[in-house]
Amino acid sequence: MGKKIISAIAAVGLLAAGVYLGSQFGSDNSATIVGGADRYAQKSGATSAAVGSLAKSVGASGKGQVHAVRDGESIQAAVQKAQPGDVIQVYPGTYKETVYIDKDDILLSGVIVDGQWPTMEGGQKLNDAVLYSGNSITVENLHITHYKGNAIMGQAGNNFLIRNNRVIDTGVYGIFPQLGKNGLVSNNVLSGIEDAAIYIGMCDNVHVNNNEVFANVAGIEIENSRHSIVENNKVYNNTGGILAFITPGLPIKTTFDVIIRNNFITDNNHPNFGAPGSIVSGVPAGTGIIVMAADEVTIENNIISGNKNVGIVITDHDSFANITKDPDSDPHSDKVSILNNLMFNNGAEPIDDIKALKIASLTSGPVDIISVGTSRDSCLLNPGQYPSLGTKSFGTCGFSTTADTVTYLLPEPVAPREFKLEEKGKMVYYGVCAGCHAYNMRMIGPPVETIQALYMDNPQGIVDYISNPTKKRDDYPAMPKQDYLSPEIRRAAAEFMLNTDSKGVFHDPALNQQK
């Protein structure tokens, strides 16, 4: 998550100084009717299939050989023996390892016996628990704890199913599918994550439901992703609850067609425990939902309460300084629709910038919704239902529910892909490197521009470093080893990184579908 999230909240202070307060923060809403009932049924594979069939096109087949792994044995050794279609059953015990799945159609399933779970234990030494780059992967029934980086990370794998896992204290991210299409994240419990518990990064057609996320810095994030539904989750006691946004400088340039519905988003007031010096360490506590530069986000039928800063913030890239703009990303949050939600007891203890904004706009009492900056063609179903600031330009929504759009999961799995070596290097860059490195702004790792300046025509230098990295700067976390990738793949990814830019091949038309 980038500087945008921090700045978006703090940016309201700029408006408090008097930036078009009269036009932007009046109490009357436009009478314009915005949007129709089919607004979100676009070229996205939306379906009205029964909820019970959500997993039809995702996850492994489980039709092959069963490999049993017991306490004292290696999960990775079983993965290496497995063939597509096989099942790896992990019995209760403690497994201190990183598992990398680079094959298609593998079912990694914990076996729970008399309440005893198989535990993957990082010991605060290992970076990642489970990494997968294969397609049609299932990861389920694992207790994962004490890793430094990620519990479960997808690296350009499609048709993923991540369910029924307990993820506790796993460093930066909990569940992090990156650059995947057609995936379900369901029935997981996540707590104690320094950044985002569930982080959907540069994905399409993802369903996030029935998860419980609490005591994290960020609960659920939809970043540079399209056609996603976040529903029926319990999101509480995080620093911030649910976020939909665009990070500038990534290969995918858009976030749109996101439905946030039927969630409990309550009491997200946890003190921020992000790593000192990290970006998220500056996120203020107390915000239920943040929409930043994302389009076509619908917020419906949620219970949003007890968030001491504000219930919902809608903002854009233009509302604050000190962020590098991406010319290929629209900076505005357009076509945001706030339908019927139950909102109460939000905004009781806002940050100082929001207090200043309320004073400047002659507003008293708590505020549920704040819109900062430009938001075109956005709407409220019932204008005046919620105490709000900055929503005068919002129209009245022309539809009242998204119930007919049950899921954006595809009816059939995405077909397997075959890549040449140079294409594999690009996909590794997109699916692995871009999880921590944007082109020209800081994320978990330094900008790509900085890496290019350091290594220039020396791709082997990058290969050597990522194979056995050492911590060089106090203001960035240590980089994990990438030695699970073959030397040829590491070299191809390094060459791609050194030859990419913010436009050109970095702005990949194949990834940036039109709305």
Which residues make up each language-model segment?
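Sequence/structural segment immediately N-terminal to covalent heme-attachment motifs in c-type
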Residues: K420-Y439, G461
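Axial heme c-ligation environment in periplasmic c-type cytochrome domains
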Residues: M443-Q452, N468-Q514
